[in-house]
């Protein structure tokens, strides 16, 4: 990962994050950056992994461990140079789940409304695996507020409301 020519890093922050452990992948806010949904560069890199690692700094970025709770929704984009990353729908669900830990409501909302072509079936699959009434409630509320902008079906909102129970 270090150039013999000038001692600088050869790999980008997404490649570094994907190589920290055998199960590591780019997640949350950093995944939105990878997909070009956020124009601003942040110096915090969020890394999901089954194996724990200590947060560390490398080349001006701080890499933060996020406990991996799902195996679903992680992909290796073609021509990605070894990058492993959550797909857009998993990134949305994870960001809503951890809304107060990483980016905050305003930032997460601006990312969600910038995503094109959200696959509702993937969203429901990830919500089902997390199996959290509160996560269904938060997701249903956010998506009902932006239903028209995001072209979200009434059925998706209905399922979120049904699964949110009394939380």
PLM regions and their residue ranges:
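Short gly/ser-rich loop at a beta-strand->alpha-helix junction or flexible surface loop bordering the NTP-binding
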Residues: 1-72
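Hydrophobic alpha-helical interaction segments
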Residues: 76-167
């Amino acid at each position: 990962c270090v150039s013999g020519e000038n001692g600088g890093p050869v790999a980008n922050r997404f490649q570094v994050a994907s190589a920290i452990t055998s199960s590591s992948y780019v997640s949350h806010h950093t995944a939105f950056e990878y997909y070009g949904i956020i124009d601003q560069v942040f110096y915090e890199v969020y890394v999901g992994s089954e194996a724990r690692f200590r947060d560390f700094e490398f080349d001006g970025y701080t890499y933060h461990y996020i406990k991996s709770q799902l195996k679903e929704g992680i992909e290796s984009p073609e021509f990605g140079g070894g990058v492993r990353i959550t797909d857009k729908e998993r990134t949305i669900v994870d960001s809503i789940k951890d809304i107060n830990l990483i980016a905050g409501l305003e930032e997460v909302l601006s990312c969600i409304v910038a995503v094109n072509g959200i696959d509702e079936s993937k969203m429901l699959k990830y919500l089902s695996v997390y199996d959290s009434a509160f996560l269904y409630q938060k997701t249903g509320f956010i998506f009902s507020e932006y239903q028209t902008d995001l072209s979200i079906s009434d059925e998706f909102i209905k399922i979120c409301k049904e699964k949110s129970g009394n939380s």
